Amino acid sequence: MTKNYEEIDSFERAGFTVIVDKTWEDISPRDCFDDECWDMKQMFEDIESGRLDWFMLRVRIMVDEYELASEYLGGCLYENVRDVLTDGTAEDLIAQAMVTAKREVYRMYKKFQDISWEHDCEGAV
């Protein structure tokens, strides 16, 4: 099933494009919050009315239109979705995705080097 994502922010970092976006969350807040600690009825009312946003966060690391890495975090509950950009939530996912993206760049660099070598050899014969 395809999910539609709403972009929260995008920016350049270390030669990559970082895209932070969100989509609706499949799981119920009841699976993440305890009735003894939270007023679940009020929470559901706040989500339904739009006072709270219940979503899954995604971070993608791109070069041009190529996705090198992505990380996801479900069960996000915020009054203002943009708070994920300043409270460390998105930064944690960005850091994880950047590590993966840098590994992927190195892997692809080596692969393209091998392909280039093969093509150079073919042209020399």
For the regions a protein language model found, what residue spans apply to each?
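Acidic interaction surfaces
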Residues: 1-125
